[in-house]
């Protein structure tokens, strides 16, 4: 595929510098700053995570699954893909202590080191997670924790990328004052001998839900935050009330783990509840990390079974949870805007020379059905693999359940796939898009898919107000439009997304 000359020259210069033994600052191919280059050393101001200039920062990213089980997904290639395609600004390396983790197999720490080194090169933040779970009392392996964090802080004490999470989810017969706080004071003391200022996150009771207890008896370290964990299908307003209480007491919160599923990790997904949580976190500028990057066959996993371990994932490789999380990282304004998913929306690359034509099957301004008809044409000189191509029709669903029918397709309705995606933040003329994909087939130069006739309706068969929909316009004949966007493996190649 063709790339711009400027990008080619930039890549060539980076290659030559690397061959010459010189190290360039981490940056994207377009020369924009990475999250760490932009924000630098993090600290706490009141309840807010701030950058070196004292400006509020909201980090967003994803956590590994247990490194002893799914460590193959943690490598520079996968993290680079997550940075560039998902827009993550933080990655969490979840090193279980029990269940075949560090206590039984200390070599698993090498995967943590690999994650940190990759994050340093890529300019993203990284959380070193001492992932207690079945060993619910952090004091059970306190000396091992001190030994581990002594090593990590001695290695990375001068690295602004690093965040320490010293007790994932204390649970069982533990409480803040008697068990967790004394443990944290000892481990923090070990870290601070080597690292005076990087952020330290401390888990709270009841699987990191009792931030209210920590808020009433806070640690003295100036750069400590308190972990809040939730799973959207299980935890609701009662937990947000605890968070509000903690914030009112001046306790900074970091959501180092949350899932779209229920608390088991394998029930759901609960997207409406997830949206409610993300709206809340955005309103408070609370950083978050989603669980989890793996292909485990459970609903909280971001990837479908068998997905590549080194990135390069197509949208079809993502689970419902992964699709939602990626969309919501890309669809919000934070430090990730320096690492865009796609070229500028105003000037997308026309890599394959493909375009889309549209006509309205129902031109009524108010109708209980939306009936877009479209065809995709290959205007280029090379054959296009339709499995890599997706199209998005942007419109307003107004939080109603959506239904899809393919009435006719020259390439066969059985070859057309679809999904509805609700935007975390509505855009001009759209709170939802219909994404079409194709199971197989190719387009030779000059060829077209032919007519694809679609029909959408609300669950309750209520009317749509099409006149304000971004992708809609009234036309009885096929016309080229840039308000229906096309993507190659998730990368925008035709059209303009709504603002």
Curated annotation (Swiss-Prot):
Its EC number is 3.2.1.4. Keywords: Carbohydrate metabolism, Cellulose degradation, Glycosidase, Hydrolase, Polysaccharide degradation, Signal. GO terms for molecular function: cellulase activity; cellulose binding; glucan exo-1,3-beta-glucosidase activity. It catalyses: Endohydrolysis of (1->4)-beta-D-glucosidic linkages in cellulose, lichenin and cereal beta-D-glucans. GO terms for biological process: cellulose catabolic process; glucan catabolic process. The active site is at 169 (proton donor), 257 (nucleophile). Residues 350-499 form the CBM3 domain. It comes from the Bacteria. InterPro entries: CBM2/CBM3_carb-bd_dom_sf, CBM3, CBM3_sf, Glyco_hydro_5, Glyco_hydro_5_CS, Glycoside_hydrolase_SF. Substrate binds at residues 65, 69-70, 96, 131, 231, 263-264, 291, 296-298. Residues 1-29 form the signal peptide. Belongs to the glycosyl hydrolase 5 (cellulase A) family. This is Endoglucanase. It comes from Bacillus subtilis (strain 168). The lineage of its organism: Bacteria, Bacillati, Bacillota, Bacilli, Bacillales.
């Amino acid at each position: 595929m063709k790339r711009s000359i400027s990008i080619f020259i930039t890549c060539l210069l980076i290659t030559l510098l690397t061959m010459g033994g010189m190290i360039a600052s981490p940056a994207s191919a377009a020369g924009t700053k990475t999250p760490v280059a932009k924000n630098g050393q993090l600290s706490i101001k009141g309840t807010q995570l701030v950058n070196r200039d004292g400006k509020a920062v909201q980090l967003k990213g994803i956590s590994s699954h247990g490194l002893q089980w799914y460590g193959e997904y943690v490598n520079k290639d996968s993290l680079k893909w997550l940075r560039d395609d998902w827009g993550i600004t933080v990655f969490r390396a979840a090193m279980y202590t029990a269940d075949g983790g560090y206590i039984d197999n200390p070599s698993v720490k090498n995967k943590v080191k690999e994650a940190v080194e990759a994050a340093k090169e890529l300019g993203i933040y990284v959380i070193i997670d001492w992932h207690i779970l079945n060993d619910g009392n952090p004091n059970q392996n306190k000396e091992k924790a001190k030994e581990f964090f002594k090593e990590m802080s001695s290695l990375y004490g001068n690295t602004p990328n690093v965040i320490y999470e010293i007790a994932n989810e204390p649970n069982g017969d533990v409480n803040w004052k008697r068990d967790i706080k004394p443990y944290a004071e000892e481990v923090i003391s070990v870290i601070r001998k080597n690292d005076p200022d990087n952020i330290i996150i401390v888990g709270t009771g009841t699987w990191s839900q009792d931030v209210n207890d920590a808020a009433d008896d806070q640690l003295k370290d100036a750069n400590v935050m308190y972990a809040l964990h939730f799973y959207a299908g299980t935890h609701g307003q009662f937990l947000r009330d605890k968070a509000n209480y903690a914030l009112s007491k001046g306790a900074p919160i970091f959501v180092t783990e949350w899932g779209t599923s229920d608390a088991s990790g394998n029930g759901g997904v609960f997207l409406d509840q997830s949206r409610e949580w993300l709206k809340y976190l955005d309103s408070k500028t609370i950083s978050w990390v989603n669980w989890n990057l793996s292909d485990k066959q459970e609903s909280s996993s971001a990837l479908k079974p068998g997905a590549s371990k080194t990135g390069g994932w197509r949208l079809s490789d993502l689970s419902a949870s992964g699709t939602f999380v990626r969309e919501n990282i890309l669809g919000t304004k934070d430090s990730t805007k320096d690492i865009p998913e796609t070229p500028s929306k105003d000037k997308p690359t026309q890599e394959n020379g493909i375009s889309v034509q549209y006509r309205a099957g129902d031109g009524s301004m108010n109708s209980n059905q939306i009936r877009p008809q479209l065809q995709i044409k290959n205007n280029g000189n090379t054959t296009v693999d339709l499995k890599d191509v997706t199209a998005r029709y942007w419109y307003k669903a107004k939080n109603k359940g959506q239904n899809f029918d393919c009435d006719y397709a020259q390439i066969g309705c059985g070859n057309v796939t679809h999904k509805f995606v609700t935007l975390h933040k509505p855009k001009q003329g759209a709170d939802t898009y219909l994404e079409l994909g194709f199971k197989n087939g190719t387009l030779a130069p000059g060829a077209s898919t032919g007519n694809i006739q679609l029909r959408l309706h609300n669950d309750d068969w209520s009317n749509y107000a099409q006149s304000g929909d971004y992708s809609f316009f009234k036309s009885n004949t096929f016309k080229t439009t840039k308000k229906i966007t096309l993507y190659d493996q998730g990368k925008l190649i035709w059209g303009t997304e709504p603002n």
